[in-house]
């Protein structure tokens, strides 16, 4: 996800970017994950009515990771993270998240922790929007038997026998499944939705990528990186970079 985000940022700022992926599918571990994003005090949380501040989040990070991470890195994360989410929201039509309420901070009992959590997750997306890129998205490793649900919905449906909210969510999921069969929609959630939304936005921006292409080495000139050497289809290729190279190593 970070590599896609970096390339998309370049595209949105007027640069021409090119992603290489050593595997045959895009997404990596992010596509197989829950897709949750933990960035305190972002605008999605604010819109959901979550009361949070930079100071509270900093207190939580200090209580959980202490001095194992440099202060400048913690400060940058807490400052630039919300800016990143706002940037993608304002400059794309498809990168959208929602608050995953009650996904508690892992150490909610520590100073600055939130029992209701700070996590957000990608909204469900119809993969048909990706068109020819859909087939390049990494397949999930666990089947949900036709049901597509967010992490928040999963939490609610697990309470189906105990709460009205659980029953209502179950009905919502069933309706979504029937609707998808009727319309041909191919919904994705969690990590696949995260990668799909990044990929769709990258595609709309004019970005390009190439799969089955492995990084081999940097091309150097006077101690500067000016490109990369890659291996693709048994051939070694040299790709020049005018503005820089970013490694997305997962």
Residue ranges and their predicted role:
Residues 41, 249-250:
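Glycine-rich, N-terminal phosphate-binding loop of Rossmann-like dinucleotide-binding domains
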Residues 202-217, 238-240:
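A conserved beta-strand/loop element that lines the FAD pocket in flavoprotein oxidoreductases
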Residues 233-244, 248:
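Core beta-strand elements of the Rossmann-like FAD/NAD(P) dinucleotide-binding domain
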Residues 223-229:
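Short, hydrophobic/aromatic-rich segments at coil-to-beta transitions
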Residues 23-25, 215-219:
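Acidic, glycine-rich active-site loops and adjacent beta-strand->loop/helix elements
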Residues 22-208:
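Conserved N-terminal/central alpha/beta ligand/cofactor-binding core
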Residues 1-19:
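N-terminal Rossmann-like FAD-binding beta1-loop-alpha1 element of flavoenzymes
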